[in-house]
């Protein structure tokens, strides 16, 4: 695997020097300063690429070129935003950047309720608490019809939880959910959030798939033409939330994508921490079935709690993800490619890490502190080395 590291640009508290010292050779970044929908010019791409290369690294993957909400709702200037997206792909290819991670999650990107969940060893992790989320949706957001998405016991627990919350607790929970986490290009006030949710009132899973298919049929031929590989990121968490449909959550969703636009430019990001939240997602089977179309991997683990819809981010080699079998399947796919004459390594980043050690005293991006990811990268690197030596050493 090609070892990479997500970097949020010049304002990231983790520097490119830090990235190189961590042992990564590739950088995963994006032009976050360009508003959603606007074209990434060759000049802007080259500026960022030069910064990365001056540090002795390579810009390996774009994460992400965000998709304008008009495209997802098929309203407003969606055709203009698609044309702009096509041009951005052409410009990236012109600059020698050929792997693009993106997602099709409506309104919200990845979602957590607690950004400072304290683990038994004193480090901090990210957590999604189903009951806290229900308390937000039922008692703060007050979304009409939300009760239908929860069991009677969850509704009762959410009411009790909400009753114990201070005003600061409520404000923090609201911020965590709607203000935008790292990599999310949209953040909202509560009123704005309600307005955006309302735009999906008549959009169910089938309708959102129609809109996604329209996007894929416009984008993938351009990607194919210029040699760009599109790698869709799964929904996080991988299930409907807030009354919004989610359509990249299961192996069935992956199969639908391939059948909708059967081009090798239409591929996947294997994010084990997203897909792995669902007990019915067999990650190794996903890799084996769609290995040739996996162009990027996020390797991390989560641990489901007593309520299986509640989870926290576990250490990379622990939790519900069998990281050994996942890495073995990825390495086997790379060797399959090599046997067919390709030296195409799959970029891997350790994804979220725990906030720990000296980083507990620093301001960090949630999930993206340096030391926790350094630990995760080192652990995954060790697993890969052992697999390579045990099964593929001549």
UniProtKB/Swiss-Prot annotation:
Record field: catalytic activity: D-mannonate = 2-dehydro-3-deoxy-D-gluconate + H2O
Keyword DNA repair: no
Gene3D superfamilies per UniProt: Divalent-metal-dependent TIM barrel enzymes
Superkingdom of origin: Bacteria
Keyword Lyase: yes
Pathway noted in the entry: Carbohydrate metabolism; pentose and glucuronate interconversion
Keyword line: Iron, Lyase, Manganese
A molecular-function term among this protein's GO annotations: ferrous iron binding
Family: Belongs to the mannonate dehydratase family.
PANTHER family registered for this protein in UniProt: MANNONATE DEHYDRATASE (PTHR30387:SF2)
Function: Catalyzes the dehydration of D-mannonate.
Official protein name in the record: Mannonate dehydratase
Lineage: Bacteria, Pseudomonadati, Pseudomonadota, Gammaproteobacteria, Enterobacterales
GN (gene name): uxuA
